[in-house]
């Protein structure tokens, strides 16, 4: 498996509103997307952009790795359990892009890695799946099909 672009770092939070204030006021984030619900996954999500590569003029292009803020919706046991262990929230997962989600899934399975569920539509509108942290150096890892042009 060839390592793809780091698309985002997922951060579980008990309050997206409080996390937005933190990234804006403490970390200086200037582009924070509107939060939205993903009922199929039981979460509310908000993306915070980080600067992309320098253009050489001191300015940054868009397209840096994003922070994905994740707040559980009622009934979401997995994120709620994470927050019970980590009441202030914290890093939940990392997400890498691949060109073909089904080929990536087959490769990971052939290596004996535990895929957590079938590919499904994620927050960027592309197919995703997760890999068990015990098989990934202790890190819950999301694999996502690279977004179409213009999407992040």
Explain the meaning of each model-derived region.
Residues 1-20, 89-96, 146-152:
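N-terminal beta-strand motif that seeds the catalytic metal site of vicinal oxygen chelate
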């Amino acid at each position: 498996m060839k390592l793809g672009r780091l698309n985002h770092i997922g951060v579980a939070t008990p309050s997206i509103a409080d996390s937005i204030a933190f990234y804006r006021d403490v970390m200086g984030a200037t582009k924070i997307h509107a939060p939205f619900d993903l009922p199929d996954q039981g979460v509310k999500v908000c993306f915070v952009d980080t600067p992309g590569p320098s253009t050489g003029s001191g300015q940054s292009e868009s397209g840096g790795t994003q922070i994905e803020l994740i707040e559980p919706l009622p009934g979401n046991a997995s994120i709620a359990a994470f927050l019970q262990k980590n009441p202030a929230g914290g890093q939940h997962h990392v997400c890498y892009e691949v060109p073909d989600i089904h080929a990536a899934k087959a490769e990971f399975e052939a290596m004996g890695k535990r895929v957590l569920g079938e590919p499904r539509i994620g927050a960027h509108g592309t197919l995703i799946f997760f890999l068990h942290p015990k098989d990934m150096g202790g890190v819950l890892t999301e694999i996502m099909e690279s977004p179409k042009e213009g999407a992040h």
